[in-house]
């Protein structure tokens, strides 16, 4: 990271990942080309992250060819005029993580991953979860991404006095 003053610790980065409405997962496809997709991921242990999709398609082919992935999450991106010097900038909170993707084959783990996703994004509809699983488990792919190193975080944020908060300073 070029600007060390904006670096945040891995715990902070995990918070960003948990709060992000989606995380862009970057794959390398079977032809060696980059392929990034915004996906809805969920995790309970901060190491294993799950997403779901169709049983076939480009991302599954990419995982089979190159299971290494990069995750990028952003929770705040606010265009700002710098309070001190009038410069145009962005305030942001972001996280980057690296991991290995694997297509889940065991039904119990598929259900676990889907439950995490549903609990995160549609907790008010958990009463319909079992019916949905019965209807669609056999036609749903679930992928587990296991982080291979702690995520890194970065932010640009100003405090109430217009001073940039650097070196992990919190308000």
Task: For the regions a language model picked out, list residue spans one by one.
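Short, basic/aromatic recognition patches
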Residues: 1-24
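Charged, gly/pro-rich active-site loop segments
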Residues: 2-4, 78-171
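Anion-coordinating catalytic cores for phosphoryl-, nucleotidyl-, and glycosidic chemistry
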Residues: 5, 58-61
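Short, intrinsically disordered, mixed-charge
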Residues: 18, 64-69, 116-123
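Short beta-strand segments
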Residues: 20-55, 71
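Histidine- and/or cysteine-centered catalytic micro-motif in compact active-site loops
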Residues: 28-30, 54-56, 74-76, 100, ...
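Beta-strand-connecting loop/turn residues
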Residues: 46-47, 67, 148
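Helix-adjacent hinge/juxtasegments
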Residues: 60-90
């Amino acid at each position: 990271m070029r600007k060390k003053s904006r670096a945040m610790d891995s715990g902070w980065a995990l918070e960003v990942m948990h709060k992000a409405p989606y995380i862009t997962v970057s794959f390398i496809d079977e032809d060696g080309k980059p392929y990034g997709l915004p996906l809805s991921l969920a995790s309970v242990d901060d190491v294993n992250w799950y997403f779901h999709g169709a049983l076939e398609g480009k991302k599954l082919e990419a995982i089979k060819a190159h299971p290494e992935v990069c995750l990028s999450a952003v929770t705040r991106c606010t265009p700002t005029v710098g309070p001190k010097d009038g410069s145009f900038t962005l305030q942001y909170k972001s996280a980057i993580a690296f991991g290995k993707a694997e297509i889940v084959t065991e039904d119990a783990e598929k259900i676990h991953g889907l439950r995490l996703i549903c609990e995160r994004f549609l907790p008010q509809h958990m009463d319909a979860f079992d019916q949905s699983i019965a209807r669609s488990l056999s036609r749903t792919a679930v992928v587990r991404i296991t982080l291979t190193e702690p995520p890194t975080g970065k932010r640009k944020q100003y405090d109430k006095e217009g001073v940039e908060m650097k070196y992990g300073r919190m308000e």
